[in-house]
Every structure is written in structure tokens, then in C-alpha cells.
Amino acid sequence: MAGIVKNQGGLAFSGDNYKVVKEILDSGEKIPLHNHEGEDVVISVLKGKLEIHLNDDEIHTLVPGDIIGFEGKNLVKGTALEYTEFNETLIKK
């Protein structure tokens, strides 16, 4: 089989230079402040509404279909404003 379908939370796929993680958050659940030094980050919201804070001075409210990308050296934290599912792709530099 050429394709693999995954729809559960957690690590979905990984390779030498990337990881794709599906995150599932309940309403009000927080993503603690952190960074991904040495990687680029791409977040794609599938369901719900996610508020992302970058470096404590930039706020983005993401809804299904929205994609945000940023360098992993930036500090990031977030809050699910409702039940939310999103894919996070980490790409090594």
C-alpha cells in the first residue's frame, strides 16, 4: 500500500528532517510556553479555534483552514478556545 492514513492524536509521521504531530485539545486546554530551536514550525487547524501567542507580543486566532508558519526559535504558547484539532509539522533546518 502506498498511502498510510492516520487520524489519532500524537506522532503521525516522521522522517530524518521532519515530524508531523496531530494535537487534540479540549476547550480551555493550554499549550505551555516553549520553542522548537533548530526547526521551522507549521500549524494547520483542522477543527475548532486555536489562539497562538508568539513571543508574548503577537496573537493569532486560527480557525479550520488556517495555517501559520514560523521559525522554531520563537517562543510559542496557545489556548484552545473550543475543542480543537490541529496538525503541527516540525521541519529541521
What are the residue ranges of the model-derived segments?
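A short beta-loop-beta micro-motif enriched in histidine and acidic residues
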Residues: 16-18, 28-41
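Short acidic-glycine-tyrosine-enriched beta hairpin
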Residues: 56-73
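A cytosolic small-molecule/anion-sensing beta-strand core signal
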Residues: 46-47, 63, 82
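Ligand-binding loop in jelly-roll beta-barrel domains
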Residues: 72-93
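Glycine- and acidic-residue-biased ligand/ion/polar-headgroup-sensing regions
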Residues: 38-50, 55
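Short histidine-centered beta-strand/loop micro-motifs
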Residues: 31-36, 54, 79-80
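A short, N-terminal "cap"/entry segment at the start of jelly-roll beta-barrel domains
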Residues: 1-21, 32
